[in-house]
Regions:
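Interdomain helical connector at the RecA1-RecA2 junction of SF1/SF2 helicase-like NTPases
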Residues: 167-224
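Conserved RecA-like helicase motor-core motifs
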Residues: 8, 36-38, 51, 57-72
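Conserved Walker A/P-loop ATP-binding site and its immediately adjacent core
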Residues: 18-20, 33-56
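Walker A/P-loop
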Residues: 3-24
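Pre-Walker A (Motif I) flank of P-loop NTPase domains
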Residues: 2-8, 35, 82-83
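Conserved motor-coupling elements within RecA-like helicase/translocase cores
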Residues: 69-85, 99-103, 120
Length: 224
């Protein structure tokens, strides 16, 4: 509604994140102010799984991007069918990297690199939805995406957001500092439906935890 800012949605596993993200993608697809809607996953198997799920909800909704070349063609395409694109963060990162081997080979041949071909999209309004945004959204690929698409709005879906208390800590210039949190990347929490909510609503099964502390290492190895 506000046409600005980023945000993340904290929905627990099994609560229907894929269906929610599909509905968000279809609404964005029909928004004339949005040039593209990218749904970005962090693994190849999730790429296939998401496409299959989206196409179950609406047949022919998204096509397979077999490689980076296909991804780039769909990104620059003005075909309405190519407005929603499901891809991996690795493929998108590769398309925006001018220093990789493939880009250097294209330069030698006098061909445009993937990044150069995507230049017309640089200042376009693009919505980028990151699945499982607690995982690989803090690396170089994510930085490259944000730098190349400065006007993009970023939305993240996660069942386990990274907060300061569960972030990984490291030494930074001799002082202790934590890695980036989900809020640092995606700013505002748009909605939360946690495991507690899901259990209370009986949408997921309750679970019981037992703690066992062996008396010594020998007992531990025997138990394992």
């Amino acid at each position: 509604e506000q046409n600005r800012g980023n945000g993340y949605i904290w929905h627990t596993t099994g609560s229907g994140k894929t269906l929610t993200s599909f509905k968000a993608s279809t609404l964005l697809k029909d928004n004339r102010n949005i040039a593209k809607c990218l749904f970005v996953v962090d693994r190849k198997d999730l790429d296939r799984q998401t496409r299959e799920e989206f196409n179950k909800f609406q047949e022919g909704c998204v096509e397979e991007n077999t490689n980076t070349e296909t991804l780039v063609k769909r990104l620059v395409s003005e075909d309405y069918r190519d407005k929603v694109i499901v891809t991996t963060i690795q493929k998108l990162g590769l398309a925006l990297d001018d220093d990789n081997k493939r880009s250097k080979e294209k330069k030698k041949k006098g061909e445009l690199t993937y990044k150069e071909r995507l230049a017309p999209l640089k200042d376009s309004r693009i919505a980028i939805i990151f699945d499982e945004c607690h995982r690989s959204q803090f690396g170089e690929n994510h930085k490259a995406i944000k730098n190349f698409f400065p006007k993009a709005q970023l939305f993240g879906f996660t069942g386990t957001p990274i907060f300061e208390e569960n972030a990984t800590y490291k030494q930074i210039d001799g002082t202790i500092g934590c890695y980036t949190t989900t809020k640092d990347i995606f700013e505002k929490e748009l909605h939360a439906y946690t495991i507690t909510h899901a259990i209370d609503d009986r949408n997921v099964l309750r679970f019981h935890i037992d703690y066992f502390k062996p008396e010594n290492d020998r007992d531990a190895s025997r138990t394992v």
